[in-house]
């Protein structure tokens, strides 16, 4: 397909991004061209926009931003057989090699040669995006576009929540950004006994309560450890899920986690996190898990089933703002201030 399209591009090594006109991507024999119908803003996009230290070390401008999306297939390569023009699709954002040890042992989500849409390759903040056929996920057309556009981060939440048992457990959710928020209805739907949402932003605490948290805690004003201990008969939380990457919050989590408990960490700390391994890990007999992305493609099938069973309706309050793609800056500002849930853009 020839022609120009509108895209949000990180053009320079500095804060911000630009709306530009650029050529519609040309696909190869194993690729698919997708017309983007909706795309959502991720925390990674914010990092790239504000140009933090991670972005400076990873991003090579010019780069079209964005990686969470839903769209319609408009062109397929000559070797493509599993996708057809007209399919409503999203995409796994980790483009993997399929040849390294991780890929060959069922751990493609931690492929040693991963490329990420909107980070290493041009992304979805555009009218069109190209992706490998192997990354395309065919959607259920009965699910709203806004919900389909957030399946990638929802997959992160699903991977984190279900990396262990949560049924009948007391669960602490650290950080109620969009992915942390998604964990709450997941936990509620699957039978967690208590859900503690730990979040400093007033807006997000209110939304966490609306989504089903049994107790919301402001860590800047309340004693998180005492509250969780007192509401779990002194035992502590069976499961601690960190979506914040905040070193203080992670250390606190190790204080209020129950003996034999599980901590799963998706959040990315900016600095090293000193912890008391002897008393809070070894003597407590806990398990600490690092979570990266989505298990490919187990997590996607789980997401599909959950959305079909009613989770799509549960998630609607998380999408708090929508804008045309050309007004992406409004969404970025809301994300930076923590005054939103999920922000969806329409090209």
Swiss-Prot record:
Residues bound to Zn(2+) 2: 97, 100, 103, 111
EC number from the UniProt entry: 1.1.1.103
Annotated site residue numbers, Important for catalytic activity for the proton relay mechanism but does not participate directly in the coordination of zinc atom: 152
Gene3D superfamilies in the record: Medium-chain alcohol dehydrogenases, catalytic domain, NAD(P)-binding Rossmann-like Domain
InterPro entries per UniProt: ADH-like_C, ADH-like_N, ADH_Zn_CS, GroES-like_sf, L-Threonine_3-DHase, NAD(P)-bd_dom_sf, PKS_ER, Zn_alcohol_dh
A GO BP annotation: L-threonine catabolic process to glycine
Cofactor: Zn(2+)
Coiled coil stretches, renumbered: none
Binding site for NAD(+): 179, 199, 204, 266-268, 291-292
Pathway per the UniProt entry: Amino-acid degradation; L-threonine degradation via oxydo-reductase pathway; glycine from L-threonine: step 1/2
SUPFAM superfamilies with a match to the protein in the record: GroES-like (SSF50129), NAD(P)-binding Rossmann-fold domains (SSF51735)
GO MF entries: L-threonine 3-dehydrogenase activity; zinc ion binding
Subcellular location: Cytoplasm
Co-factor: note: Binds 2 Zn(2+) ions per subunit.
A Pfam cross-reference name: ADH_zinc_N
NCBIfam families, per the entry: PRK05396.1, tdh
UniProt record similarity statement: Belongs to the zinc-containing alcohol dehydrogenase family.
PANTHER family in alphabetical order: L-THREONINE 3-DEHYDROGENASE
This protein's name: L-threonine 3-dehydrogenase
Organism from which the protein derives: Caldanaerobacter subterraneus subsp. tengcongensis (strain DSM 15242 / JCM 11007 / NBRC 100824 / MB4) (Thermoanaerobacter tengcongensis)
Lineage: Bacteria, Bacillati, Bacillota, Clostridia, Thermoanaerobacterales
Recorded name of the encoding gene: tdh
């Amino acid at each position: 397909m020839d022609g120009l399209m509108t895209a949000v591009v990180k053009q320079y090594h500095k804060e911000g991004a630009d709306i530009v006109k650029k050529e519609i991507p040309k696909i190869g024999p194993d690729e698919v061209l997708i017309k983007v119908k909706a795309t959502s803003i991720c925390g990674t996009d914010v990092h790239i926009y504000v140009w933090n230290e991670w972005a400076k070390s990873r991003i090579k401008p010019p780069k079209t931003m964005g990686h969470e999306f839903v769209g319609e297939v408009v062109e397929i390569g000559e070797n493509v057989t599993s996708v057809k023009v007209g399919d409503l699709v999203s995409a796994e954002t980790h483009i993997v090699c399929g040849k390294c040890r991780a890929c060959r042992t069922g751990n493609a989500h931690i492929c040693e040669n991963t490329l990420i849409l909107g980070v290493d390759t041009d992304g979805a903040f555009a009218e069109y995006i190209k992706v490998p056929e192997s990354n395309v996920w065919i959607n259920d057309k009965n699910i709203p576009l806004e919900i389909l556009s957030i399946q990638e981060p929802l997959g992160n939440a699903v991977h984190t929540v279900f990396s262990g048992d949560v049924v009948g457990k007391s669960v602490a959710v650290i950080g109620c950004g969009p992915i942390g928020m998604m964990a709450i209805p997941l936990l509620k739907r699957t039978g967690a006994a208590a859900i503690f949402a730990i979040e400093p932003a007033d807006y997000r605490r209110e939304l966490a309560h609306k989504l089903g948290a049994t107790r919301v805690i402001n860590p800047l004003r309340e004693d998180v450890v005492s509250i969780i201990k007192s509401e779990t008969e002194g035992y502590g939380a069976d499961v601690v899920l960190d979506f914040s990457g905040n070193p203080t919050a992670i250390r606190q989590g190790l204080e209020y986690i129950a003996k034999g408990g599980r901590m799963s960490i998706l959040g990315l700390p900016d600095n090293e996190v000193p912890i008391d391994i002897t008393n809070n890990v070894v003597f407590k007999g806990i398990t600490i898990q690092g979570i990266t992305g989505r298990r490919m493609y187990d997590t996607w099938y789980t997401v599909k089933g959950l959305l079909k069973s009613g989770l799509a309706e549960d998630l609607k309050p998380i999408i708090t703002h929508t804008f045309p793609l050309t007004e992406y800056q409004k969404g970025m500002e809301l994300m930076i201030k923590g005054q939103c849930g999920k922000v969806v853009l329409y090209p």
